[in-house]
């Protein structure tokens, strides 16, 4: 079955399968951001607080598992040696990552069809990224920044898994 993505959650623009949605001033993620986000920078958004919520939508309820891929990098320093990120989707816990390296991170989680909420034929969901080690650089003497940072979000993509060939 082909899943046709488009607006399902009120006010949320289409999510096209396999097409990255970029964060930042030049990206298209802004309408998907619900709460817990700092102002856009050129090519990314930081979370601002312990939770950051993101809306996803599809025109039809998916009949197969989809994957959410999020690219970014953690806020780390000598006083913040790691970031733990838990992903909830419509209340279900879908993933946990412990990140202790500054290089780019790929967070990937499977979203089963039953995790989506339906409205008419459309499907929608709310991703909540819980980042409990988010810190204000000002509070730990690292900068004058008052934002509560944990992860720098660069892009997200909804993808359908590629079927495995038998043989």
Model-derived features: where do they sit?
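Short beta-turn/strand-loop junction motif enriched in small, turn-promoting residues
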Residues: 73-76, 114
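Short loop/turn positions at the edges of beta-strands in beta-sheet-rich folds
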Residues: 60-62, 91, 101-103
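Cysteine-clustered segments with highest specificity for TGF-beta superfamily mature ligands
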Residues: 120-136
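Short, surface-exposed beta-strand/strand-loop-strand elements in extracellular ectodomains
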Residues: 80-93
């Amino acid at each position: 079955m082909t899943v046709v993505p488009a607006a399902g959650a009120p006010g949320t623009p289409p999510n096209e399968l396999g097409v990255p949605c970029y964060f930042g001033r030049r990206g298209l993620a802004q309408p998907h951001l619900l709460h817990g986000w700092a102002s856009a920078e050129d090519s990314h958004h930081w979370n601002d607080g312990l939770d950051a919520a993101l809306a996803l939508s599809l025109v039809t309820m998916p009949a197969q598992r989809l994957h959410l891929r999020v690219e970014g990098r953690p806020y780390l320093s000598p006083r913040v040696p790691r970031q733990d990120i838990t992903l909830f989707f419509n209340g279900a816990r879908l993933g946990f990552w412990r990140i202790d390296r500054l290089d780019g991170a790929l967070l990937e989680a499977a979203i089963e069809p039953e995790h989506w909420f339906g409205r008419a034929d459309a499907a929608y969901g709310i991703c909540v990224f819980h980042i409990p080690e988010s810190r204000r650089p000002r509070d730990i003497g690292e900068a004058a920044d008052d934002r509560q940072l944990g992860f720098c979000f660069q892009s997200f993509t909804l993808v359908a898994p590629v079927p495995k060939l038998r043989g």
